[in-house]
Regions:
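Cleft-lining beta-strand/loop regions that shape enzyme active-site pockets
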Residues: 1-196, 206
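Active-site lining segments that contact anionic ligands and/or coordinate catalytic metals
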Residues: 148, 173, 197-202, 221, ...
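Short, functionally important structural connectors and interaction interfaces within domains
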Residues: 17, 117, 199-200, 216, ...
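Conserved functional hotspot residues or short segments at active or partner-binding sites
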Residues: 215-249
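Metal-dependent DNA phosphodiester-chemistry modules and their immediately adjacent helices/loops
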Residues: 159-161, 198-216, 220
Length: 249
């Protein structure tokens, strides 16, 4: 059935809160297939030899929570899709992989954890610091490494949250190069509490790289910097007036 959400908006140039606009938007179902991982293989000739480079375009760290909680074995997730792509790359004798996380704003923390495990078996993916000060290392020993050949990660200023967890772990374990621009700098974890007329999002913890550095505010600095079409000082967590500061554990 058709359902709608009503937004009450106060224009930024309004002199007082009595000036409001009412906008009604029809809800639509977002199909996971529309933002699923995609792959391409390019051939590169160097010194008379041909190399195959596999590109994985990952727009988000998606997970079908309802199917996963219902223990549906066919639930959709980014880590499952990427694993299938890597298996296909092996069959086609791909020499190296580039994971494209540009404009990937994040997603499920568990998926960032599992995806990291597909490329390295080194250990924890990240550390989470709770509001009470407890520090919990995160890793998933059940995930088997699916790719051991060379790899790199492509990021930009809009790569955030789970993207930064993945890129940071790949960099900290020296598993591959991070290429592009400094990432967004979102290093916090949120939860959703249900209310009678909606939900409340609460920031409850911060995550840290295995090196102990936070990604909050500073993001991930790439190993190889590519030119940017925008000023990084006007985009990202650090550009927000009330952002939480960077720290380390």
């Amino acid at each position: 059935p058709q359902t709608f959400v009503t937004l009450e908006i106060i224009p930024g140039d309004a002199e007082d809160n009595s000036v409001r606009k009412i906008i009604e938007i029809e809800r639509e179902i977002v199909e996971l297939e529309e933002r699923a991982a995609k792959s391409k293989i390019y051939s590169l000739n160097k010194n008379g030899s041909e190399y195959k480079i596999g590109i994985i375009d990952l727009p988000s760290f998606y997970l079908d929570f309802e199917a996963w909680q219902a223990r549906d074995p066919n639930y959709k997730s980014s880590s499952k899709d990427v694993k299938n792509i890597l298996e296909d790359f092996k069959k086609q004798s791909v020499d190296a992989v580039l994971v494209d996380l540009r404009n990937n704003s994040g997603g499920a923390l568990t998926e960032a954890n599992k995806l990291t495990g597909l490329f390295t078996s080194a250990g924890a993916t990240l550390q989470i610091k709770e509001s009470n000060g407890n520090i919990i290392p995160w890793g998933d020993a059940r995930v088997r490494q699916a790719w051991s050949k060379p790899m790199a990660v492509l990021v930009n200023r809009y790569s955030a949250s789970a993207s930064e967890i993945f890129a940071g772990a790949i960099q900290d374990y020296q598993r591959g190069l991070v290429i592009g621009q400094r990432t967004f700098g979102k290093g916090t974890v949120q939860r959703l509490d249900n209310l009678s007329e909606g939900q409340l999002k609460i920031t409850e913890s911060k995550f840290y790289r295995v090196s102990g550095d936070s990604t909050q505010s500073r993001g991930i600095d790439p190993d190889i910097v590519l030119p940017s079409t925008w000023d990084i000082e006007t985009v990202g967590e650090s550009s927000l007036p009330t952002h939480l500061p960077w720290d380390k554990i």
